[in-house]
A protein has these predicted regions:
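Amphipathic, well-ordered alpha-helical segments in soluble domains
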Residues: 27, 31-34, 38, 59-69, ...
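Short amphipathic alpha-helical coiled-coil/interface segments
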Residues: 56-63, 86-93, 121-125
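A ubiquitous short alpha-helical element
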Residues: 49-56, 81-87
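Short, solvent-exposed, charged loop/turn and helix-capping segments
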Residues: 65-86
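Generic structural signal for short, flexible, solvent-exposed coil/loop and linker residues
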Residues: 6, 45, 59-62, 68, ...
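C-terminal amphipathic alpha-helix
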Residues: 1-53, 99, 103-160
Length: 160
């Protein structure tokens, strides 16, 4: 009584890590969604996305917060692989933000800067998916797999 076993200490540190990491992962995921929306706007709109500049500024702030949150994590040994992917997601999200900023004003959709942006967004998403497989509680939501997605009746003229 009152003495912690090695297993108990590890479990407690893992729970503390998971709690802190979940908050950071949610911030990364939300910011990834913001940057992906901004990228979609850049790629599909012929006009400059001046209204979206505020969204990009907020995304920049969120990217910095997410990176700081990940750097502050103290991963116990059992969470080292998970932490590796959290760092990867935060790093790639920073790259995506830099790339999104660089894409402003690009007129040609075949511009290499868009490739850099898309690659960084995809890599961030890949790292987030890896975190979902490594520890419980980090699963990403796939609305395409929701029960209503399979059973919802399709109306005439509604795509696939």
């Amino acid at each position: 009584m009152g003495v912690y076993s090695c297993v108990g200490v590890t479990e407690q540190s893992l729970l503390r890590y998971a709690d802190s990491a979940r908050t950071a992962q949610q911030l990364i995921s939300q910011t990834l969604t913001q940057l992906s929306g901004y990228a979609l706007l850049l790629l599909t709109s012929r006009r400059q996305a001046t209204l979206a500049e505020g969204a990009l500024a907020l995304a920049r702030q969120s990217v910095v917060q997410a990176a700081e949150a990940v750097r502050a994590l103290q991963a116990p040994e059992p969470a080292a692989h998970h932490y590796h992917h959290m760092r990867g997601a935060a790093d790639m999200l920073l790259e995506a933000c830099v790339a999104a900023t660089a894409c402003r004003g690009a007129q040609d959709r075949s511009d290499r800067r868009f490739d850099t942006l898309i690659c960084a967004l995809r890599a961030t998403s890949d790292h987030l998916r890896a975190t979902a497989r490594l520890l419980p509680g980090f699963e990403l939501i796939d609305f395409g797999q929701a029960c209503c997605a399979v059973h919802a009746p399709r109306l005439p003229g509604q795509g696939l």
